[in-house]
Amino acid sequence: MLVLLLGASAFAVDLGWIFLNGSRLQRAADSASLAGVVNLPVSPSGALVDAVDAAGRNGFPIVANGATTLTPSILADNRYKVDMTTTIDTFFLKALGFSDFEIFKTSTAEYIKPVRLGSPDHTFGVPGSNFWAAINGQFTEKQQGDPYATRCLTTTFDTGGARCDTSNEGPDGEFRDWGYFYVIEVAEGSSNLKVEIYEPSQAVNDDGSPSSDTSEQLWRWDWTERFVTTTFKLLQPDETPFAPFDNVEQCSESFPRISTSQEWETLCSDPVSVPGSLDAGMWLLNIPSPPYEGTSMFGIQASVDGGPAPKVYGLFDMSIFVNIDGDEATPFLAEIRPEHEGKTFELDIFDMGDNEINTEAWIEILYPNGDVVDCSWTSNNVGNESAPTGPCRIDITNQRFNDAWLKMEIDLDNYMCDITQPLGCWWKIKIHNEGQAHDRTTWTARITGNPLRLVP
């Protein structure tokens, strides 16, 4: 009887030891997968280096002929799996012939990407899509629809060089000289990347009226420094695609103002922008804040030889010119995917509703199936208006949000969409405007919460 009790006690001690080390190994595997996934899709080797480092820092060094092994698997461009096996010595079970015990644990981590904005395909703001990509010159007044590319809350009416009216309200605190970024997402097996810009130059004529389908404008025709010179910088993929400020520049090209233009221009070289085979990754197109005054609208499209068509979309935010055919447009807003379930979708729109006074105008935020979502909203407009959660149809009549932010919050609890369909998770925004059929505006969208998570 005593022998049985001693055997049971020995087994209990070793079982607890095995359980403790299993828990430790699981924590190490979780840390390794989370550390590795942030390197995808650009650097699988970097993912392995970081995963091995995380495992070691959690008590399981990965060395040649060591007790612990780590095997990585790339399940998707944002999913990283780690299998870890370790061997531990036993205590009392040695007497029963079990000198060591092997433990196996696995962990899969997912990096939740920033939401894709504005386009589900290889184009952004092209003819016939109801909107254009856009950017305003640095010395354009903020109320003209671009809070980030413009320095000025107001400008002077004097002739001479472009400048802000610092005697009134001062410079725009939201200004950023780097402007906007667009992603050109290239898949494995692609080659010969071609990036084209539709009407890259500001095209306006000297009587102040639009001279192209993009309806480009100036507001200070008497300035000696006027018009917009737009620059496009194509940046190479790197290991941190969502931290775009350290990417290596592939090429850059500037386009000064011209009188008329309605053509596609291949960026940087012809016939392709980047010749040869391409690794999977995210090329970036940067449009920095240009001199001097006015607005420039343009379209973007990308193509490759071999492999699927690239994806082109706004990163973090998009500054656009909505060009409505009739009194209603329903452009794509953002791709909200199943992994965003349980989080909050925050949508900020600046200067929405450049409509004629006393004409009906409203917007609706739509699920992929066309149903209106529920949202709450606040604004820094006159009156600092707000509304509790309810159907997200917001009246924008009489320029209600002129020169102001409209900030919406949308709860994604129990959210589902069909990711197997090309447009199955793409939300839209319906813009109804019975008066003036265009709007210069800027949209910012994000998913709140930790972008890293463990998945089964």
Task: Pin down the residues of each PLM region.
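Alpha-helical hydrophobic helix detector
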Residues: 1-13, 27
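Short amphipathic secondary-structure patches
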Residues: 16-23, 31-91
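Short, charged, low-complexity patches
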Residues: 25-26, 104
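Short acidic-hydrophobic sequence patches enriched in Asp/Glu that either
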Residues: 28, 47, 99
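Small-polar (Ser/Thr/Gly)-enriched, low-hydrophobicity segments
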Residues: 78-116
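N-linked glycosylation sequons
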Residues: 104-456
